[in-house]
Regions:
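Glycine-centered signal
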Residues: 1, 29-32
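Transmembrane beta-barrel domains of Gram-negative outer membranes and organellar outer membranes
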Residues: 33-304
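Charged interaction patches that mediate protein-protein contacts
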Residues: 1-3, 20, 60
Length: 304
């Protein structure tokens, strides 16, 4: 039964990702060779190339001591609006084993880079509107007093409670001798009468080698980027700090193919009793360069 549920939820979550990639490929949009980092929670200062579209799928398999295991999954559609602005739309869903598979909501994210060139530290401003229900289990970030027991509420109960939030991040990132170092400070305000909540994420990553291969290849070491991230909650306005918060550390690996595909995997380990003991995250993405120009040309071609 477990394997059947898991296979069904994986098949469902992959469907939208595969369909979008197939439609986009049919439009003959060339792929852009890019080097994506392995982070799934933390952000660095790199934005999407202007006019490029990246379609992404991610999964989180989670274990729980107080409830059934779950599979949270989401699709992302990331577009480079300008050189300093990237916008992204999320669709979230989850399967809780022994209960149900449900759609949990959507998110609209925007990242703004105020400094055009590379600096010692590169800031990015992050703003997101989130409209999900309490059954959401993608764990895209940890905020406030989010703890493992929050995710044990049955889907039939949790899905009735709506969360509409504004999320803000200050991203400080630097590339140095092949390394990337990043720090994210998180502040979240529920649009109801709840206090501000806070969190953080830290990350460091580096390609396995900085030497480029003499020929095009898929398995060259420069296409593999290893890293680690750590993230957790910092309480809220009335009880700021580490008390009754959860924290995680996650080593990860990204494999960037010259064709435009990127694959990520990230085992995640809870650092205290309030955290999930183990999460397994993985994802795939495909980047289409010149997507905006292709769409414009399609519309121009239909003008009378």
């Amino acid at each position: 039964m477990f394997s059947q549920k898991f296979a069904f939820s994986c098949s469902l979550s992959w469907l939208s990702f595969v369909l979008v990639c197939a439609v986009s490929a049919a439009c003959f949009v060339p792929a852009l060779e890019a080097q994506e980092n392995p982070y799934i929670v933390a952000y660095d200062h790199n934005l999407e190339e202007p006019g490029s579209l990246e379609v992404e799928y991610f999964s989180t398999f989670g274990t729980q001591r107080g409830g059934p295991d779950f599979h949270g999954f989401w699709s992302e559609f990331e577009y480079g609006a300008t050189a300093w602005w990237t916008t992204e739309f999320y669709l979230d869903a989850q399967s809780t084993f022994g209960e149900s598979t449900i759609f949990t909501g959507f998110r609209w994210e925007n990242r703004f880079r105020p400094l055009k060139t590379e600096h010692f530290v590169n800031p990015v401003l992050y703003v997101e509107f989130e409209n999900v229900n309490e059954a959401d289990k993608i764990l895209k970030e940890v905020e406030g007093h989010d703890v493992e027991s929050d995710y044990a509420v049955p889907n039939s109960v949790a899905r009735k409670e709506k969360d509409r939030e504004m999320e803000f991040k200050l991203i400080l990132s630097r590339n140095y001798k092949g390394w990337n170092f990043t720090e994210n400070t998180l502040a979240v305000k529920n649009l109801s009468n709840n206090p501000w909540e806070f969190g953080y994420a830290l990350g460091a990553s580096r390609p396995l080698t900085l030497k480029g291969a003499a020929h095009r290849c898929n398995f060259c070491l420069q296409h593999l980027i290893a890293g680690v991230e750590m993230y957790g909650g910092l309480g809220d306005r009335y009880s700021f700090g580490l008390h009754n918060t959860s924290h995680y550390v996650a080593p990860g690996l990204a494999w960037n193919l010259p064709s435009g595909w990127t694959f990520r995997i990230e085992p995640t380990f809870g650092l205290n009793d309030q955290s999930h003991q183990f999460l397994l995250r993985w994802g795939a993405s495909y980047e289409f360069s010149g997507f905006g120009e292709t769409v414009q040309n399609l519309f121009k071609g239909h003008r009378p």
